[in-house]
Amino acid sequence: MDKIDIYSDGACKGNPGRGGWGALLVMGEREKEIFGGELDTTNNRMELKAVIEALNLLTRPCEVVVHTDSQYVQKGISEWIHGWKARGWKTAAKAPVKNVDLWQALDAAQARHKIEWRWVRGHNGHAGNERADALANRGVEVAA
């Protein structure tokens, strides 16, 4: 099984506002950069979109380490999602889960992979995270 590191980030100018997502995929010596943007979005949606887009590029099951500076993504996918699904995509307070479309897409995208979700402190000199941040900001610039 191939081993991949994914560094993902989202950015938003205004929240909601113009946003971008970016991801760096690293497999051994090979790297791939991806990014994109949306005009009317939130930082959390862009954080989720970055991981979804990166995972959807993988053509076969892989061992993946996802590095994200978003506790929303890291805790959501590794802790909260189980309860949400059990409650029919409702929170513990019985409210609809925010960004449910993207959470469902992420749940589907991660299903065939073995994934370790790692939180990294943002803007702290972590090379992969800094590159993902730069890609997310490029996504903001191209948002249309």
UniProtKB/Swiss-Prot annotation:
<dbReference type="InterPro" id="IPR002156">
    <property type="entry name" value="RNaseH_domain"/>
</dbReference>
<keyword id="KW-0540">Nuclease</keyword>
<protein>
    <recommendedName>
        <fullName>Ribonuclease H</fullName>
        <ecNumber>3.1.26.4</ecNumber>
    </recommendedName>
</protein>
<feature type="binding site">
    <location>
        <position position="133"/>
    </location>
    <ligand>
        <name>Mg(2+) 2</name>
    </ligand>
</feature>
<comment type="similarity">
    <text>Belongs to the RNase H family.</text>
</comment>
<feature type="binding site">
    <location>
        <position position="69"/>
    </location>
    <ligand>
        <name>Mg(2+) 1</name>
    </ligand>
</feature>
<feature type="binding site">
    <location>
        <position position="47"/>
    </location>
    <ligand>
        <name>Mg(2+) 1</name>
    </ligand>
</feature>
<comment type="function">
    <text>Endonuclease that specifically degrades the RNA of RNA-DNA hybrids.</text>
</comment>
<keyword id="KW-0479">Metal-binding</keyword>
<feature type="domain" description="RNase H type-1">
    <location>
        <begin position="1"/>
        <end position="141"/>
    </location>
</feature>
<feature type="binding site">
    <location>
        <position position="9"/>
    </location>
    <ligand>
        <name>Mg(2+) 2</name>
    </ligand>
</feature>
<dbReference type="GO" id="GO:0000287">
    <property type="term" value="F:magnesium ion binding"/>
</dbReference>
<dbReference type="GO" id="GO:0003676">
    <property type="term" value="F:nucleic acid binding"/>
</dbReference>
<keyword id="KW-0963">Cytoplasm</keyword>
<feature type="binding site">
    <location>
        <position position="9"/>
    </location>
    <ligand>
        <name>Mg(2+) 1</name>
    </ligand>
</feature>
<dbReference type="GO" id="GO:0005737">
    <property type="term" value="C:cytoplasm"/>
</dbReference>
<dbReference type="InterPro" id="IPR036397">
    <property type="entry name" value="RNaseH_sf"/>
</dbReference>
<keyword id="KW-0255">Endonuclease</keyword>
<dbReference type="InterPro" id="IPR022892">
    <property type="entry name" value="RNaseHI"/>
</dbReference>
<dbReference type="InterPro" id="IPR050092">
    <property type="entry name" value="RNase_H"/>
</dbReference>
<keyword id="KW-0460">Magnesium</keyword>
<dbReference type="GO" id="GO:0043137">
    <property type="term" value="P:DNA replication, removal of RNA primer"/>
</dbReference>
<dbReference type="InterPro" id="IPR012337">
    <property type="entry name" value="RNaseH-like_sf"/>
</dbReference>
<comment type="subunit">
    <text>Monomer.</text>
</comment>
<dbReference type="GO" id="GO:0004523">
    <property type="term" value="F:RNA-DNA hybrid ribonuclease activity"/>
</dbReference>
<keyword id="KW-0378">Hydrolase</keyword>
<dbReference type="Pfam" id="PF00075">
    <property type="entry name" value="RNase_H"/>
</dbReference>
